[in-house]
Regions:
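Active-site C-terminal subdomain of aminotransferase-like
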Residues: 1-67, 71, 135
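Short, hydrophobic alpha-helical segments
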Residues: 47, 151-155
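Conserved C-terminal alpha-helix-loop-beta "cap" of PLP-dependent enzymes
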Residues: 70, 74-142
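Short amphipathic C-terminal alpha-helix that caps PH/PH-like domains
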Residues: 143-151
């Protein structure tokens, strides 16, 4: 088949590898091999731990964080029934929450606000909490505790 992907075109990778094996040099600006290996290792780790177990943990963490924020009066951008388990995007009026600087001051990195790109007003502000990472899902309670300790100081 012919690939329509630049980054995962296996025929291109094969030609690159064959060039090296034949003593030549080739350049293809794609993900480094060590990143591919790290991704493979993560996939294997995920499979070993259990896809269903991690899926349930991801939903548990996302639901807990969303419920916690709602209890603090923080409204989610996602309507009920349209939430994602690994990302929580919420409204704020505080520019230092929106840009993540209040979190950074407490040693936590978040993503800055997410524009909706649907004619929102100029003062529109959100912040995004990424709940990704196997380390976070292996112990939902500990992850939730670390997050809420910072949220209690920031909000």
């Amino acid at each position: 088949t012919n690939s329509d992907s630049f980054a995962i075109d296996l025929k291109k990778w094969l030609s690159i590898m064959q060039t090296y094996e034949n003593g030549g040099h080739a350049y293809h600006a794609t993900m480094p091999t060590d990143a591919l290996r790290a991704f493979r290792d993560t996939v294997l780790e995920t499979r070993e731990y259990g896809y269903e177990k991690l899926k349930l943990a991801q939903w548990e963490l996302g639901d807990k964080v969303r419920k916690y924020l709602a209890g603090k009066g923080i409204k989610s951008v996602a309507a009920e029934g349209f939430t994602a388990p690994g990302v929580v995007v919420s409204y704020t009026q505080d520019s230092e929450i929106q840009n993540g600087s209040k979190f950074a001051a407490k040693g936590m990195q978040i993503a800055a606000g997410v524009p909706l790109a649907c004619d929102e007003p100029e003062d529109f502000k959100t912040f995004r909490l990424g709940l990704f990472g196997l380390d976070k899902l292996y112990n939902v309670e500990a992850t939730f505790k670390r997050l809420t300790m910072v949220l209690d100081q920031v909000l």
